[in-house]
């Protein structure tokens, strides 16, 4: 990775961290703000969260083509402006139509930003540095969210709408800071993706080309299961289970969420050293087993009666184990998407995977809240245990479809170097033994 690429990457990650910092001010309080502070009711609050998800689902199918045609930089800037407008509008809105319109702008903007930033990171990294680049982004993102949430909690007053206007105003400014930061980035002229599949004709056939890539389709299926089993449960299913079955207080639930973030921040770079030279498919399979243990701990927390401290400890361990698994996935999944993508379809692949994530994030809370709300607690936890085990099975099956370089770039690079060295040695021996010097010189020239 060149010095210019490193400088560009640092700017991208700085902007992303500041944006996450602003996002942390509002994420924990959006439901309370709409339902209680603005007095619009639980129905409108639920519709607001639904609008955020639907807006993302609408724009993501078109985002990849825009990134591949126009480049990730202008797309990211458009996304930050939309998100900033939506966030500020959310803080100033006092009626249902304005809240929904602001949520649409906010959801669409955030959805556009994610694959654009991912593509910029791919352009500014190499296969050997990509895992560390995405791990650093994930670390900074969680650190920003955690610090922002902590400061936001000190500033918020649910009896004063003005305090929420400040929170959303800060978030809006941070989105604009992200846009201004990435606008100063000097991206490489072309993406540096090795071992890409043949690009074929595009852009009209971009989605068809992606669907023909069986490894990518398999990874998308795996991604849906992963996001459904973890992120898709944080906001609704697991939170409802924790309060209704484990019977922890909302304050203790906040501590559990903080433990999740702390686990990521503390373990990210330790985990990175352990996994970056391992087979990616095996790392994802291990995450499935870790999350299986996490859901078993959650199940046990609901069965411990008369020992609330033990139940609370089990629940917090669930969130900690989720955090460890997340820190293992950050240097694994996003780089694999990039390495599977043809050079001219990086944006399309990133957007497709973001779309899969959004689908899981939309369906996960819906199903989780429904099962817990109906009192089907055993069925809920059993389903998530099966999903977690499914991660392991799907990851191992995916590993059979990947090349050595895709599953482990370090091994792939080593094998290529050994092959080139062996070829060079063979050419040298052949040249030395040749009776005709001119012919041997031709062979060396061709080999070079």
Regions found by a protein language model. Give the residues of each.
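Juxtamembrane intracellular "pre-TM" segments in multi-pass secondary transporters
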Residues: 1-9, 187-222, 412-424, 445
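Helix-loop boundary and gating motifs at the non-cytosolic
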Residues: 3-54, 217-257
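Helix-breaking motifs and short loop linkers at transmembrane-helix boundaries and internal kinks
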Residues: 39, 71, 92-97, 247, ...
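Helix-to-loop junctions at the C-terminal end of transmembrane segments
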Residues: 59-71, 156, 266-281, 372
């Amino acid at each position: 990775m060149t010095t210019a690429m490193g400088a560009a990457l640092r700017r991208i990650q700085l902007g992303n961290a500041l944006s996450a910092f602003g996002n942390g001010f509002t994420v924990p309080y959006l439901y309370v703000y709409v339902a209680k502070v603005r007095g619009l009711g639980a129905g409108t609050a639920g519709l607001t969260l639904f609008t955020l998800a639907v807006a993302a689902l609408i724009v993501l199918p078109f985002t990849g083509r825009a990134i591949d045609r126009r480049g990730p930089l202008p797309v990211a800037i458009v996304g930050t402006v939309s998100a900033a407008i939506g966030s500020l509008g959310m803080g100033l809105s006092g009626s249902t139509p304005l809240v929904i319109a602001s949520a649409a702008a906010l959801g669409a903007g955030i959805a556009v930003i994610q694959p654009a930033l991912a593509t910029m990171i791919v352009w500014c990294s190499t296969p050997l540095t990509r895992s560390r680049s995405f791990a650093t982004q994930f670390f900074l993102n969680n650190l920003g969210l955690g610090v922002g949430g902590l400061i936001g909690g000190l500033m918020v007053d649910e009896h004063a709408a003005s305090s929420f206007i400040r929170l959303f105003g800060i978030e809006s400014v941070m989105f604009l800071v992200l846009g201004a930061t990435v606008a100063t980035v000097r991206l490489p002229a072309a993406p540096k993706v090795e071992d890409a599949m043949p690009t074929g004709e595009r852009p009209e056939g971009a989605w068809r080309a992606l669907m023909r890539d069986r490894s990518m389709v398999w990874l998308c299926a795996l991604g849906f299961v992963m996001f459904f089993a973890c992120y898709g449960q944080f906001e609704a299913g697991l939170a409802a289970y924790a309060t209704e079955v484990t019977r922890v207080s909302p304050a203790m639930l906040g501590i559990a969420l903080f433990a999740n973030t702390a686990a990521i921040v503390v373990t990210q770079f330790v985990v990175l050293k352990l996994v970056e030279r391992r087979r990616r498919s095996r790392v994802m399979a291990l995450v499935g087993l870790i999350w299986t243990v996490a859901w078993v701990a959650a199940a046990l927390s609901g069965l411990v009666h008369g020992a609330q401290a033990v139940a609370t400890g089990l629940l917090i361990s669930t969130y900690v184990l989720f955090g460890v698994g997340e820190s293992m996935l950050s240097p694994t999944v996003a780089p694999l998407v990039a390495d599977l993508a043809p050079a001219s379809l990086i944006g399309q692949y990133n957007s497709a995977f973001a779309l899969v994530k959004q689908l899981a994030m939309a369906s996960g809370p819906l199903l989780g809240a429904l099962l817990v709300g109906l009192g089907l607690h055993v069925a809920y936890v059993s389903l998530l245990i099966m999903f977690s085990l499914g991660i392991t099975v799907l990851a191992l099956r995916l590993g059979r479809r990947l090349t050595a370089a895709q599953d482990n770039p370090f091994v792939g690079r080593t094998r290529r170097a050994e092959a080139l060295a062996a070829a060079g040695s063979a050419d040298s021996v052949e040249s030395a033994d040749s009776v005709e010097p001119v012919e041997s010189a031709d062979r060396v020239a061709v080999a070079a």
